Each structure stands twice: as structure tokens, then as C-alpha cells.
């Protein structure tokens, strides 16, 4: 799993049943990993996190081991997690509860984030990214050479 990297944006459309079609480049990587199930949960910035099952198990174990003062965040991540299968047409169903929490209606943006994905409402993603680009760069990035 450590060598698999999902990257790049994909503008997608939710169908009438709340499904997205997994882009071919990601579908091929998932198939090579033997992954046919994903886990979807809430992201603290108003989007959704989508994990291949092996990456989810690692994330889930890390979250579950957090101390009691993080119990609220455990509920956000673990209590909202839903397993979904990638269907024969390479579609992924996003549960209505999770679609509502992230404001997903039609136009969405799937971002490859290394070991997992983020799924954003397209307008919310554009606004969030614009705000990030206007904010000061955090100290942790100031040492990067661009």
C-alpha cells in the first residue's frame, strides 16, 4: 500500500442515485491492489474522505487509539464511516447522510491525496482552495523550494 499514490483532481458528476464513476487512472490502481471496497467518512473541512480498505484499516486503528479527550473526533471519523463496494460499472455510491454533510448535490471534485481521496462539492472546493491560496503560507511549508 505504501507505494500506491493517488493524485490529481477529477471533476465528476453525481448521478441520480448519488454515485460517482471512479476515474480510470484510480480504478486501475485500485484493481492492481485487489481493492473492491472503499470506506467513506467525514472530513473536518466539510468534504468526505474516501479510503481504499487497507488504508482505512490503518487510519481507523490510529483514530481508535487516540486518547479519550479526542472522543468527539473519533465519532466524526469512525461513527460516520460507511463501507461501499465499487460496482461492476466502477461506480461508488455515496450514502445520502454523507452527501448531505458535505453538501454534495451534483458537481463534485475528487482529489487524489496519496493514500486516499477527498470528495468535495465543486463550488465549495473552489472557494476553499481560493481561501487557502490567499492565506499566509504556514511555517511548515516556508522551507520548501517551489
Task: Enumerate the language-model features and the residues they cover.
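Flexible "stalk/tail and boundary" regions
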Residues: 1-10, 16-17, 26-84, 88-89, ...
Amino acid at each position: 500500500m505504501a507505494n500506491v499514490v493517488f493524485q490529481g483532481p477529477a471533476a465528476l458528476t453525481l448521478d441520480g442515485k448519488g454515485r460517482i464513476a471512479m476515474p480510470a487512472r484510480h480504478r486501475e490502481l485500485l484493481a492492481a491492489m485487489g481493492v473492491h471496497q472503499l470506506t467513506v467518512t467525514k472530513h473536518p473541512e466539510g468534504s468526505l474522505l474516501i479510503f481504499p480498505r487497507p488504508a482505512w484499516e490503518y487510519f481507523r486503528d490510529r483514530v481508535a487509539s487516540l486518547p479519550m479527550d479526542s472522543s468527539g473526533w473519533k465519532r466524526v471519523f469512525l461513527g460516520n464511516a460507511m463501507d461501499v463496494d465499487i460496482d461492476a460499472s466502477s461506480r461508488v455510491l455515496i450514502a445520502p447522510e454523507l452527501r448531505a454533510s458535505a453538501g454534495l448535490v451534483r458537481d463534485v471534485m475528487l482529489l487524489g491525496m496519496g493514500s486516499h481521496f477527498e470528495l468535495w462539492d465543486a463550488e465549495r472546493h473552489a472557494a476553499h482552495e481560493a481561501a487557502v491560496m490567499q492565506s499566509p503560507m504556514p511555517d511548515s511549508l516556508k522551507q520548501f523550494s517551489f
